[in-house]
UniProtKB/Swiss-Prot annotation:
Keyword Transmembrane helix: yes
Full protein name: Phosphatidylglycerol--prolipoprotein diacylglyceryl transferase
Any one Gene Ontology BP term: lipoprotein biosynthetic process
UniProt main location, coarse: membrane
Presence of the UniProt keyword Transmembrane in the record: yes
PANTHER family in alphabetical order: PHOSPHATIDYLGLYCEROL--PROLIPOPROTEIN DIACYLGLYCERYL TRANSFERASE, PROLIPOPROTEIN DIACYLGLYCERYL TRANSFERASE
PROSITE patterns cross-referenced by the UniProt entry: LGT
Membrane-protein topology: Multi-pass membrane protein
Organism: Borrelia garinii subsp. bavariensis (strain ATCC BAA-2496 / DSM 23469 / PBi) (Borreliella bavariensis)
Pathways involved: Protein modification; lipoprotein biosynthesis (diacylglyceryl transfer)
GO cellular component, as recorded: plasma membrane
Amino acid sequence: MPNYINYPSWLHPEVIQGIPITWYSLSYIFIILISYKFIWYQIQSDRIDIKKEDYETFMFSLVLGAILGGRLASTLVYDKSGIYYSHPWLIFLPFDQNWNFTGFRGMAIHGGFLGAIIAPLIIINTKLKNTNVKKYFLKLTDYGSIAFSSGYILGRLANFANAELYGRVMKGGIIFPNAEPFDTNTPGVKEFASSIGLEILPHDLLINLPRIPSQLIEGFFEGPVTCMLLWFLFRKIKKYDGFIFGIYVMLYAFFRFFIEYLREPDKDLGFIINYKPIKSLSEFSFLNISMGQILSLVLMFSGLIWVVVTKKIADKKIKNNTNLAYKN
């Protein structure tokens, strides 16, 4: 009996084949809408005095920063073809070098995090300098963390629809049509194929093997699980504004770091720290570290710094308010 699952033949990157509207693009639209609605609902629920037009300006900067940051990180850090260095305008255009429409398929969330902080910081210190958006900025980051994590899984489902970001070889896994095939002469390949019921014919030089659906695992833990932890646990123990955002960054980085062990390293990059070169299907090492894991460690440390800094800001406000009350 076959011990693998074939990728659904009816599933395609486009919502309707032949029409350039992709699940990936729709996932971003829905995540933005969910975040916009949720954050505004929280503002109204907590009776925070922020004008709608100021909030929309803030959200525009946040979305723009996230997209630019994610796009820059994907094209300049992960892509090693050199196409974006020789044709930098392609970074911000939904076309390839031959002007075929592709949409914005390459995004890296680590860069998105950075852009989603830098762009709003710029706008609240310029256009929104004298508004309550600046006053409640840290509170808004907390709202945004819960909002984004609630819709995050949509992006990973879109990755699955694209048959991309799949995991390593596993019995009972899914045979992704776009996965890189293995040379049948690689040690362990024929034995593995035979053990799961895949037939290798004498003339077959390459074979596609089942993979871990790591994009779905990432989506589950970095999305719903993280969101529930933020909402039901950390929201209740929150002592100051900015705390939840810092915790969210650390939670995301924590889950991402360990789930990366299940994920196939990026083809162009491989392992950044290649302690033990992999020569067969059965070999594995926790000391082989990918780019995603390195960036996740940086992100985790950044989240910790955010928690510490925002705690000091909160303590300073309490001290100033106490001194003011004492003087009065």
